[in-house]
Design a protein with these regions (language model features):
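Histidine/acidic-residue-rich catalytic or RNA/ligand-binding cores of hydrolases
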Residues: 97-101, 144, 173, 227-229, ...
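N-terminal signal peptide c-region/cleavage motif recognized by signal peptidases
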Residues: 17-18
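His/Asp/Glu-enriched, well-ordered alpha-helical/loop segment
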Residues: 105-107, 251, 255, 320-321, ...
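Histidine/acidic residue-rich metal-binding segments in metalloenzymes
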Residues: 146, 201-298, 327-347
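Metal-associated gating/positioning segment near the N- to mid-region
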Residues: 80-155, 171-175, 240, 264, ...
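C-terminal cap of metal-dependent C-N hydrolases
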Residues: 44, 382-384, 388, 401-438
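Histidine-rich, glycine-flanked metal-binding segment
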Residues: 32, 37-83
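Active-site gating loops and adjacent loop-to-helix segments of metal-dependent hydrolytic enzymes
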Residues: 94-115, 171-190, 225-238, 295-330
Length: 438
């Protein structure tokens, strides 16, 4: 039997056997980068049933050969470059960094309901930019968990979300939600707090988040730029606390992502066994050795570094405690990324959007390329590597039969010019075509 005839016969049998309400989508791809790092393919047809890629075949299949299907959509991308949906491993979809007075107003006068509404808007911006999967690493209460579930059910358009819930911090540390608040404004309910002191509390904080349904654990191993305290950016958890967190998370099947700027905190977190370091600003040769030895990932967030560097130049945008840290740390992140990448550290794409405008995630590609990463490796970082870090490489990261239908298209070849990733013109997220706003 000829290959094309066999393909059509197989397709028809799949459609006949599929559930009555199955959605069938046929996509013609002019150029297909199905597995970043491998040679592009030309004139390909992708068949999707519901949210799963059923087949990818050479040539443009005539839509008429699909047969009679109640819910059928044909997508012509024969003039486009088609890729796997992108993955951002560091986002905050339910918030955004604003000038200090507005940020404080929101902290004291708005509720989690406001954050939920913001999350719906920001999720749509993110998926329209071609990011069909994100790790959401830090958000108030259960807001991001609810957003994840509503996206999964198809009620809200947005990316597939892997959610950490509130980050775990030491008292007074980077993610202590009561920092800079008057005692009378501090929340009373323990569920609103993100602090843990000592190995026992650290283990309990991990278990409590897993009870709430998180997909991973986020910790703040060091101080942070945007916490409104003059506590620096060095190590904040003790080594035994870090070890307790990682051990408790592993026992329940969760990975740990560690926010870390200072060298001592980066290295302590890596020795404890975290899966990723977020930011990694002051990494050193020992850090690089530990990254490679532990097969850990750096999530660079250059996007956020550029944002805080720029805003630190505006009088009054940040309170004094933040302004000084932003001016010092922001300019260093891109260079730290460059050194890590050159040394062979695993890189997983991540922006820290929320620090910077939602929907601008692809700007990170430009910054990574400026720092010496090839266009091909940029794409690998946001697909294959990111999927491996999340632990979802059997579902996302490449376009292959049996994987999720997360598919995007851009107007020109990103291997020649990575800036084309700023101009996504088509998105399917988990089998759903996303109408674009522009």
């Amino acid at each position: 039997m000829r290959p094309l005839t066999l393909f059509i016969a197989t397709t028809l049998s799949l459609l006949i056997c599929a559930p009555t309400l199955a959605k069938t989508t046929l996509i013609h791809c002019g150029t297909l980068i199905d597995v970043p790092g491998q040679a592009p393919k030309h004139n390909q047809s992708i068949l999707v049933i519901d949210n799963i890629i059923v087949s990818i075949t050479d040539g443009f299949i005539d839509p008429g050969t699909i047969g009679t299907v109640d819910d059928f959509e044909f997508v012509d991308l024969s003039d486009s470059f088609v890729l796997p949906g992108l993955i951002d491993c560091h986002t905050h979809l339910t918030g955004e960094i604003l000038p200090s007075h507005e940020r404080m107003r929101r902290r004291t006068q708005e509720s989690e309901a406001h954050a939920a509404i913001d999350g719906v808007v920001n999720a749509k911006k993110t998926v329209e930019a071609g990011f069909t999967t994100v790790r959401n690493v830090g958000s108030p209460g259960s807001v991001a968990l609810a957003l994840r579930d509503r996206i999964n059910s198809g009620i809200v358009p947005g990316p597939r979300m892997f959610v950490s819930g509130p980050a775990v911090s030491v008292t007074g540390g980077h993610a202590d939600s009561t920092n800079a608040l008057s005692p009378i404004l501090r929340p009373d309910l323990p569920s609103h707090l993100s602090t843990a002191d000592g190995p026992s509390e650290a283990r309990k904080a991990v278990r409590a988040r897993i009870r709430e349904g998180v997909d991973l654990i986020k910790i703040t191993a060091t101080g942070g730029v945007l916490s409104p305290t003059a506590a620096g950016v060095d190590q904040q958890f003790f080594d035994d606390e870090l070890e307790s967190i990682v051990q408790a998370a592993r026992m329940m099947g969760r990975k740990v992502a560690a926010h870390a700027h200072g060298t001592d905190g980066i290295n302590a977190a890596l020795r404890a066994g975290v899966s990723s370091i977020e930011h990694g600003t002051y990494l050193d040769e020992e850090s690089i050795r530990l990254f490679i030895e532990n097969d850990a990932y750096l999530v660079p967030t250059i996007h956020a570094g550029k944002f805080v560097e720029d805003k630190a130049k505006i009088d009054g945008y940040f309170p004094d405690a933040i302004q000084k840290k932003a001016a010092e740390v922001g300019p260093l992140i891109q260079d730290s990324f460059a050194r890590a990448h050159k040394a062979g550290v695993n890189i997983a794409f991540g922006t820290d959007v929320g620090v910077g405008a939602h929907g601008t995630n692809a700007q990170e590609f430009i910054y990574m390329h400026e720092a010496g990463m090839s266009n091909e490796d940029c794409l690998i970082s946001a697909t294959i590597n990111a999927a491996k870090l999340i632990g979802a490489e059997n579902q996302i990261g490449t376009l292959e039969p049996g994987k999720s239908a997360d598919i995007i298209a851009v107007p020109s070849n990103p291997l020649d010019d990575i800036s084309t990733m700023l101009h996504v013109q088509f998105v399917i997220a988990n089998g759903r075509v996303i109408p674009l706003s522009q």
